[in-house]
Amino acid sequence: MSDDTVTPMMAQYLEIKAQHPGAILFYRMGDFYEMFFEDAALAAEALDIALTKRGKHKGEDIAMCGVPIHAAEGYLLTLIRKGFRVAIAEQMEDPAEAKKRGSKSVVRREVVRLVTPGTLTEDSLLEARRHNFLCAFAEIRDEAALAWADISTGEFSVTPCPLPRLLPELARLAPRELLVADERPLDWIEEVGCALTPLARASFDSASAEKRLCTLFGVGTLDSFGNFTRPELSAMGALVDYLDLTQRGKLPLLRPPVREVAGGTVQIDAATRRNLEITQALTGGREGSLLSAVDRTVTAPGARLLERRLSSPSRDLGLIHDRLAAVSWLTDEPRLREDLRASLRRVPDMDRALSRLALDRAGPRDMAAIRAGLTQAEAIAGRMPADAPSLLAETLEALRGHENLVDLLDQALVAEPPLLVRDGGFIAPGFDDDLDETRRLRDEGRGVIASMQAGFIETTGIQSLKIKHNNVLGYFIEVTSTHAEKMLSPPLSESFIHRQTTAGQVRFTTVALSELETRILNAGNRALELEKMHFAALRTAILDQAGAIGRAARALAEVDLIAAFADLAVAEDWTEPQVDDSRAFAIEAGRHPVVERALRRTGTPFVANDCDLSKAETPAVWLITGPNMAGKSTFLRQNALIALLAQAGSFVPARRAHIGLVSQIFSRVGASDDLARGRSTFMVEMVETAAILNQADDRALVILDEIGRGTATWDGLSIAWATLEHLHDTNRCRALFATHYHEMTALAGKLTGVENATVSVKEWQGEVIFLHEVRRGAADRSYGVQVARLAGLPASVIERARTVLDALESGERESGPRRQALIDDLPLFRAAPPPPAPAAPPKASQVEERLRAIQPDDLSPREALKLLYDLRALLP
């Protein structure tokens, strides 16, 4: 065969690959998925597996690599996480069937699934405690919408979304994949933060989208689901079209779409989410985030619901009150709370099991998960008293009424079923008499094998003779090579038929063994076919009740979250916040939940602080001054997080909290260069500040830290001053504004809504002690040089800094020509003095001398008390 001749198998591969140019093709060949050409080179590098070759094409070697079927999911996960899409081409017939069409016929193969980041369903490919959203963005003239779905759970929603709101919405949902029309300019692609998939404009056609959705949900009109705009229909239709493409016609079990109205949740932009570390720490992981600090859920659906609540705090007062009332009730019911959590720990992920059943990717364990979840649902409903708050009482209907399905699954399934249908053995004995009889025949045949082996040993006199089985030879008789000559010679050779010789072993069969093997295989195959038939029937029975099962799963997640919030409140001594439609913001003894948790590990107590921005009908701004390291940023963040937690339906880390409904949370705390877009730290800071000033309404909560620090002093002061005035006069919102520009404290006397606050420090023998206490008033200095010394700057640098600082401060105290002369005579351009000699240790104070002379074990209680008074008298 010449190099240019394409084999039938390779011709089939190239044809399938041409239909999926943007994906790596997993091409099934027996027990392996093989990859060829460029796919092989890409996959071998990404998966760190060997790259080989197989034949030639157009004179060039064909690159090849492969992964075993049994380990394919792990390799798939690696490829998906590295940004690849994978098309899976399976063998659609047995090789024996292909040979009936001719000796050169190729096994028929088809792509059964296109695996992408937003279309995962297998547990091994998903994060159990996080959603896996697929989003679609559609624009029609001046309107736009965003639809999203998690096909692993069935959640399906849509919301109006003008382009300026797209990035904040994507930050809220954190999708794995975004679908856009292929003609859409992608100038914002680097900000999306997920895989971006362009689709043909036809996928976004709103007219065909409506028909597509009606077909999916089996309805004649979508009116019962909501009054959707054309962009909303377009976005939902594109999403469903993409699912049809990737799942090859096996659409997931999506719930009817929920239309989220604009303004239903607190608006939080991407920068604020990042700064507040709501679901992800600045280091990139979950640890160190608010989510990590407050997560006490015991089920995967409960954990996913918690993430959604923290990402989307509610603005619905009635809903907030219902959630808080349920949490409050469970804090007062410790025994019930622990019983509920004990039952919830036994609840599997029913949502994802149900989704796999709908997509025909499930195994017996998914059915067992449905059985276990519904069993616990009944148990939890039975524990819930009649006087439970409305939110918990509403779950009872969803948790009850599953007895018939649970009984069916109990009768049909063994207690611990295998993972895969092909493994068999998952249908319980006694469920089907025919299956039981077939299994008996199969198992008796295996018993006969043992008897036959004993007979062969007696006949041959070879004690090491064994009857074994593999997938190639079936059942065979094996002896070591030392006995080969005996077995191959008369009279044994007349009944023992030689099959195979390997290194060290020789294998034989007999007519009787072959006949027995046929009977065993027939019984085994029939038993497996009967089990597959029952699996299909059970799958249908489960999917017939998919709606009720989904409602039970969501009810269990709600109970889990309420119980988790209650457990958190009791364990951490959190308080129920008062949330109303006032403009109040009064926090007494508030704490930062993440920082407090971190300090507890070191045995360090957290210093709680008050915050009051409760000026009625007027803006309320605290202008906070104080040194670095004193805790200003922590104070700012903790108050934003307290507001967020309250509107998410949680108790809060404070002694008391009264929060008037917050519509938006904005945070400009910390900054870094955006090198990819050529933006400096100062530019990033200004862009984020501009977004706040342009968008914050009078119910927003804004926290700003060190505005203007990235430029020249007077420029920075001017920008910070004007920003604070704009917040006060135009936005008229509640705000915490931290600054090092002490000149700004004068605004407290000029703007009625501005008050000064400072973080206290104490100086002791030249040392700075940070008290982390916020009090009314202004700081008198910044202590920057002292902080630099604590950071470990060389003593010569610290001394030089003090010299410059003294000159600058004396210049500020002068005026007119004298001040200018001092500025001109600054020591900035003089030669620096030589490094000072190491300072002698300071002379011990009288208190220290007395303490060193004490032998505590020799003191009586009376002497110790007297000594304490003496030491107090020695203090200056």
Swiss-Prot record:
SUPFAM superfamilies: DNA repair protein MutS, domain I, DNA repair protein MutS, domain II, DNA repair protein MutS, domain III, P-loop containing nucleoside triphosphate hydrolases. Residues 832-841 have a biased composition (Pro residues). One of its GO terms (biological process) is mismatch repair. GO terms for molecular function: ATP binding; ATP-dependent DNA damage sensor activity; damaged DNA binding; mismatched DNA binding. It comes from the Bacteria. It holds the Pfam family MutS_IV. The keyword tRNA processing does not apply. Residues 829-856 are annotated as: Disordered. InterPro entries: DNA_mismatch_repair_MutS, DNA_mismatch_repair_MutS-lik_N, DNA_mismatch_repair_MutS/MSH, DNA_mismatch_repair_MutS_C, DNA_mismatch_repair_MutS_clamp, DNA_mismatch_repair_MutS_core, DNA_mismatch_repair_MutS_N, DNA_mismatch_repair_MutS_sf. Keywords: ATP-binding, DNA damage, DNA repair, DNA-binding, Nucleotide-binding. ATP binds at G626, P627, N628, M629, A630, G631, K632, S633. One of its GO terms (cellular component) is cytosol. This protein is involved in the repair of mismatches in DNA. It is possible that it carries out the mismatch recognition step. This protein has a weak ATPase activity. Belongs to the DNA mismatch repair MutS family. This is DNA mismatch repair protein MutS. The lineage of its organism: Bacteria, Pseudomonadati, Pseudomonadota, Alphaproteobacteria, Rhodobacterales. The gene is mutS.
